[in-house]
């Protein structure tokens, strides 16, 4: 538990120290932002800072820092260090600069300002790269929540169409299209902050559940300085790939321009971009701690991972929450 608390403290300290160094390096000033100068009522709309933060957090987080961090805990508490230092020195820096460079270029997408600074060839490469990865990410962000809702419905005693993945996928895709064509402050600006807050509350609930439940123990880094991973999955490079979201995910650059178009002042960038990445790092740290504790309780790293992940991503998250809040219920379900 001490290792977890120290890493949590480092993330918070990193926001106020190194995050400020990054902010001063960029040099935000009092110039008009795109939200003020363009203000088209669709994509360029001034929104409150707290909304910008929560929308940005949900845009970059999602299932990534939950499921990835849980899998990353397979290597033991050493993953805490990767999440902590990756967030402070890489993830936060990347998110901040991608958002602020976009803001200085009229809120342009990453492909567009890449073309401005690196030329047309790199611009086209980035366009193709963005489209392909956005399709992949969009698929995961549709299938994952749909599966989680189906799991909740089934375990809640519901039946019929509500327990089919296709039904929820269609609803999610309909929402995708509506949110895409309607002004950003009408749906995304109203719904996303609520979901972002839920993401934070869920993470807080998880760590409280672990702390108050004597069945769980978060292992210390200094007690596990040996190789904890199973054969065939070395720390380098498997851990760094598995735990990308919550540490160093580069795909956040496609999301940062959305909020760059809605800032009233450049000075909000530190809180919105760097701060949201630190918040994601904290969420990932909590879920990694949950993974370490859960794997030990459910039979060690190898068998624990197999049990938690046996039903897929959605079932893994559901079972983890149930196991933390009510350990005996997991045994009844299985």
Where are these regions (language model features)?
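Transmembrane-helix boundary/entry motifs in multi-pass membrane transporters
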Residues: 38-51, 57, 103-134, 325
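Extracellular loop-to-transmembrane helix junctions
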Residues: 2-19, 72-102
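Membrane-interface "cap" regions at the ends of multi-pass membrane proteins
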Residues: 10-66, 262
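Transmembrane alpha-helical segments of multi-pass small-molecule transport proteins
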Residues: 5, 126-133, 153-183, 199-202
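Hydrophobic alpha-helical segments and their helix-loop junctions in multi-pass secondary transporters
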Residues: 138-156, 167-168, 180, 199-226
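Hydrophobic, membrane-embedded alpha-helices of multi-pass small-molecule transporters
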Residues: 48-64, 207-215, 225-290, 325, ...
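Residue-level detector of conserved catalytic or cofactor/ligand-binding positions
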Residues: 320-334
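Selective recognition of specific alpha-helical transmembrane segments in multi-pass small-molecule
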Residues: 7-17, 130, 134-138, 196-214, ...
């Amino acid at each position: 538990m001490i290792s977890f608390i120290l890493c949590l403290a480092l993330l918070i300290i990193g926001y106020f120290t190194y995050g400020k160094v990054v902010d001063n390096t960029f040099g935000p000033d009092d110039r008009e932002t795109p939200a003020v100068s363009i203000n088209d009522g669709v994509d360029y709309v001034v929104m409150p800072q707290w909304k910008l933060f929560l929308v940005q957090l949900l845009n970059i987080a999602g299932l990534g820092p939950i499921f990835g961090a849980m899998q990353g805990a397979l290597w033991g508490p050493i993953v805490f260090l990767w999440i902590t230092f990756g967030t402070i020195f890489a993830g936060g820096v990347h998110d901040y600069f991608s958002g602020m460079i976009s803001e200085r270029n009229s809120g342009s997408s990453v492909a567009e300002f890449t073309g401005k600074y690196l030329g047309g060839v790199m611009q086209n490469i980035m366009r193709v790269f963005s489209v392909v990865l956005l399709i992949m990410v969009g698929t995961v962000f549709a299938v994952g929540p749909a599966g989680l809702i189906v799991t909740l419905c089934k375990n809640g005693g519901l039946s019929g169409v509500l327990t089919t993945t296709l039904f929820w996928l269609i609803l999610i895709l309909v929402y995708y299209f509506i949110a895409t064509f309607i002004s950003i402050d009408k749906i995304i600006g109203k719904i996303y902050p609520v979901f972002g807050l839920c993401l934070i509350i869920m993470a807080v609930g998880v760590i409280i559940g672990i702390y108050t439940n004597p069945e769980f123990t978060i292992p210390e880094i200094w007690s596990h300085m040996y190789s904890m991973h199973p054969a065939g999955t070395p720390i380098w490079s498997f851990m760094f790939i598995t735990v990308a979201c919550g540490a160093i995910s580069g795909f956040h650059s496609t999301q940062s321009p959305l909020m760059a178009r809605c800032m009233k002042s450049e000075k909000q960038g530190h809180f919105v971009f760097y701060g949201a990445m630190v918040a994601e790092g904290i969420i990932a740290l909590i879920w990694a701690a949950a993974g370490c504790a859960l794997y030990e309780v459910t039979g060690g790293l190898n068998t624990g991972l197999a049990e938690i992940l046996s039903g897929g991503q959605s079932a893994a998250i559901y079972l983890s929450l149930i196991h933390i809040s009510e350990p005996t219920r997991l045994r009844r379900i299985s």
